[in-house]
Amino acid sequence: TNQTFGQCMKIYTEKNNFPDLSNTKIAIIGVLEGRASVGNYGTGLGLDEVRKELYKLYPGNWPINVADLGDIIEGNTIEDTYFALNELLSFLIKGKIIPIIIGGGQDLTYSNYRAYDKLEQTVNIVAVDNKFDLGSIEDELTSQSYLTP
């Protein structure tokens, strides 16, 4: 195909209506959140630059429907952002759509994990990082304490 990845996917913007997800297999979600990204300022920024480069790529030789659902903006509190992400992920997972999250910090992994609660599914998470981000139950959730031993 001569079309780029960006030309092949459904893209939601303020100008476009929310895309029909009936045949969508993968959904990209941006998260404009970085308040709990300790020592990693800007994790919720620059998503348009990431998209610009992603959209330039050429898709492989497999038919897969992808939608870019836009960005979840930073809530009044970080818990508001977690709630919005959790609700959207639960909806996508229930519809058998694989979510890909861009932006935000490692603390969003916990919200991603909790999206499976409503579905009563067991989930395993693999975290690839340069260190273990272990904290205790009592610790505030941050990018450096989102896992517990």
Sequence positions of predicted segments:
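Conserved alpha-helical scaffold segments that buttress catalytic/binding sites
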Residues: 1-30, 34-149
